[in-house]
Amino acid sequence: MTKKRNRGQAGVTLIEMMVVVTIIALFAALVLPKMMHQADRAKVTRARADINGFSTALGAYKLDTGVFPTTEQGLQALRTKPDGVENWQGPYLQKEIGGDPWNHPYVYRYPGDHGDEPDIISYGLDGQPGGEGFDADIVSWKN
């Protein structure tokens, strides 16, 4: 026995289903990369904001103590008083110092290689010095 399909009977053929799946796949292929780049751009912006916040807090630290924290004391000196430091009035940052937006530690150097201010660096997405695009370093002396 064979059943005939009535004109009023609704249904989706395999071809129609494949066309819909193909359209969805093409849409995802076009939209997802742009969304991923937007997230990476937001991380670069956050890293710059973090570095600017550290620089501001370091300025207040220096006003109180007369010096910047050493490389060994690091950015933690903005949250916890280092041994032997006079006139520390911190904490100079409200939140704990975590990693950069890619979960790599920020690099702090004082004395720095770029003037009288400390060097603060996020090594970007790849966590390695140098790089281009989202792998590029985000640094305090270029903000």
Segments the model singles out, each with a brief description of its role:
Residues 2, 44-45, 56-59, 65, ...:
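Short, surface-exposed interaction loops/tails
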Residues 18-34:
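Alpha-helical hydrophobic helix detector
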Residues 1-12:
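N-terminal leader/signal peptides at the extreme start of proteins
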Residues 9, 34, 38-83:
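Conserved hydrophobic/amphipathic alpha-helical signal-anchor segments
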